[in-house]
């Protein structure tokens, strides 16, 4: 796992936990929010393990039921298929959980937290300008009507490009990865499209500064 990718994820989680008017938050307040985000991830790992265990148990129960309750081959096949689906879901969930210990360990590193704080500070300091820039790039959408998670992913990306000087393509790729993990099924395509339409506005603003 890349430390900066984890820092972005922490910043995203932290943004969702900020109050409605975060302008007066101190650096110490932001640090506390980042710590809370790390704890949230640890809690997610525990929840995912418990859910996977329940799915495996349900899958096992369906297999047993297929042997005892099925009245014909078709109903037995349906029960077995459901059991396999539950098992596959549990395995996929466990695969995600296996990454979390490394994630949490890296998230506790100072350089990761520092970069998260840099992102948060830039987003909060320039939030009005960032939101206005994104609004101009949207087609048939209002920025404040987007899902909160998508708004925050876009804000992080613009803040990185404009104020932290992260290469544009790297930033877009990282924003897409965040959207794949946290947005809905088509969220990553939407985020990618908005950011690509935002590039001319970003370049114009960069030349004007």
UniProtKB/Swiss-Prot annotation:
Q: Does the keyword Ribosomal protein apply?
A: no
Pfam families assigned: NusB
What Gene Ontology cellular component terms go with this record? cytosol
One of the record's GO molecular function terms: RNA binding
- SUPFAM superfamilies the UniProt entry points to: NusB-like (SSF48013)
Q: State which residue ranges cross the membrane.
A: none
Provide this UniProt record's keywords sorted from A to Z: RNA-binding, Transcription, Transcription antitermination, Transcription regulation
* GO BP terms: DNA-templated transcription termination; transcription antitermination
Top-level division of the source organism's lineage: Bacteria
Q: Which family does it belong to?
A: Belongs to the NusB family.
> Any idea what job this protein has?
Involved in transcription antitermination. Required for transcription of ribosomal RNA (rRNA) genes. Binds specifically to the boxA antiterminator sequence of the ribosomal RNA (rrn) operons.
- Protein name as catalogued: Transcription antitermination protein NusB
Q: What species was this sequence derived from?
A: Cyanothece sp. (strain PCC 7425 / ATCC 29141)
